[in-house]
Amino acid sequence: MSADKFYIEKELSWLSFNERVLQEAADKTVPLIERIRFLGIFSNNLDEFYKVRFSDVKRRILINREQGGNDISKHLLSKMQSKALKLNERFDELYNELIRDMARRHIFLVNESQLDEAQQKWIIKYFQKEVLPHITPLMLTDEIDVLQFLKDEYAYIAVELKQQEQAKYALLEIPTDHLPRFIMVPEQKGKRKKTIILLDNIIRFCLNDIFRGFFDYDELNGYAMKMTRDAEYDLRHEVEYSLLEQMSEGLSQRLTALPVRFVYERDMPEDMLKYLCYKLKISHYDSLIPGGRYHNFKDFIAFPNVGRDYLENKPLPPLACADFEGYANAFDAIRNQDILLHYPYHSFEHITELVRQASFDPKVVSIKINVYRVAKNSRLMNSLIDAVHNGKRVTVVVELQARFDEEANIEWSKLLTDAGVHVIFGVPGMKIHAKLLLITRREEQGFVRYAHIGTGNFHERTARIYTDFSLLTADQELAAEVRGVFSYIMNPFRPIKFRHLIVSPRNSRSQLYRLLDREIHNAQAGKKASITLKVNNLVDKGLISKLYAASSAGVKIRMIIRGMCSLVPGLEGISENIEIISIIDRFLEHPRVLVVHNDGDPQVFISSADWMERNIDNRIEVMSPVRDARIKQRIIDILSIQFTDTVKARRIDKEMSNNYVERGNRKKIRSQIAIYDYLKNVEKHTRKQKGQVEPNDNNQ
């Protein structure tokens, strides 16, 4: 905890979140292949931590050094490094444990020294045909600025070519852009065992085939390494350059940014390590981490199953939403009543189908959507292009600064513009993180607007693994305000008022304060008062102070926080009425929801915004009331199920101990599975009421 005992540093809280991910890899009740994939998720998270959080603290240190500041950031950086090293040590222990567990199931992840003669012959052939064409050594000399050529977050093999007392060094990029990281080695017929080798080890086995005939050496050794660069970039914000041009330049900056982490194989010779640090300009503020033979463990997210179903999670087929059934089109269904989709339990196909129908429906005159992250081959985006071809007015607000998706969004922007879509890049200096879709139809009574307000991205792939809400409504008051958000994006200086939607940066802080203050006043008046909050991150000090005030006034507060949480629960007289859990399971918890008791007339809101200063004050975010009583109760039920979790819920406390919620005599409840069953029953009940046939699970 910081000197201010009321707040946990967000960077340390983030590492505590990633420790919860590592707990899933350690959990023996999780299927084996899924445990290995959690190692990949942990590693991918840690890569992003160094690119973003670590880099930010390092920059603060350098600024303080230039301006004569204090050592607070240095102290924080030291704590971050210490915690990250401990997590890496635990990671290595778990990796070795999982390798042994796989071997007990006749699955072997082998290195180059464990191959039999037949396997060696197969490996040599595979290398010559598939791998060697993608290998070009980068020889390290004093004249070459290797920092210009080394790719961020790529795994390399650093090669030592020794001849007597002299040594030359070279770098080999492991070509995972062209080849799979995991290679199945054929076995003799009738053998039960499955053998997998990493591409890294195939290259190690064939090092001589790369260098022989070009260099003289007595000994050849390879060592794993990886470098992480600072992910930030500066935009010039100059009038003569478009945002698209500025972003392209910014991404070029990222390609050559200075390193913030260097991970190397711990057996690497000292002279070689010193030379690489010199060539890569590694400073003492950067993180130098000794590791094992393999880096870029994020690739383990895609670790292959070898044909044994029990080693993976049982599939949960996405549910078809019965509210759409029995209507000629999606618009008739939405006009009849508001519809709530909860991914990945519900199929995202409902959204792609809605946009597909809008693309050719003769009544549709316009489509507006804002895009933060989308799939590479997005059907939804292609439907928007089809809509333009069919004469619809299509406006797409593309967020070019969606971190690590910038290149994909630039490419989509070009494709959409070429097709005739009106592409807008939003408000300078302010990310657009809202999840809005607005479709306008010309109907008998005039123009009718249909709106989507969501907590997650329009991304077909992540909708299968992220939990999120989509609210579809023909409520003309809400739809008019969604139209107002698009107007605000196009002209942020034009005065506009929102009576129903809560929109960052216009009124989010004041409206959230108003909602929390009302619960405080009700508690002080002796009335029942409660707040239920679910977000990814809670770090905004102003909102945390309000929550402390609410707790002190007697408001009962329950929260589900997946990631960073700077609020300290359980402080005497300050946060005793605050209970916080975090759920890490097969799906990534992503919705933002607020429920306030409101003197017995609960108000429910869904939002795109986390409770962070950037989201409340410096981004365009949308929080919407849920007005349909049926849907309000459904969201409250889902949150209630999560608070009964006795399998995957951890308590958030001031020590960041990540203890699982005590089960006691209660039965096991795994909330994600329980929510799936709950929604399945909801759909079954809806079909029964409508007299419709239950679909076959295989078709859901």
Swiss-Prot record:
- What does the entry's PTM section describe? An intermediate of this reaction is the autophosphorylated ppk in which a phosphate is covalently linked to a histidine residue through a N-P bond.
Keyword Hydrolase among record annotations:
no
Any idea which positions bind ATP? Answer: 45, 466, 562, 590
Q: List, in alphabetical order, the Gene Ontology terms for molecular function in this entry.
A: ATP binding; metal ion binding; polyphosphate kinase activity
- State the top-level EC class: transferase
Report what the protein is called: Polyphosphate kinase
* Organism expressing this protein natively: Vibrio vulnificus (strain CMCP6)
Which prosthetic group or cofactor does it need? Mg(2+)
Tell me the InterPro entries matching this sequence.
Answer: PLipase_D/transphosphatidylase (IPR001736), PP_kinase (IPR003414), PP_kinase_C_1 (IPR041108), PP_kinase_middle (IPR024953), PP_kinase_middle_dom_sf (IPR036830), PPK_C_dom2 (IPR025200), PPK_N_dom (IPR025198), PPK_N_dom_sf (IPR036832)
Q: Which PROSITE patterns match?
A: PLD
Q: Where is the PLD phosphodiesterase domain?
A: 428-462, 585-615
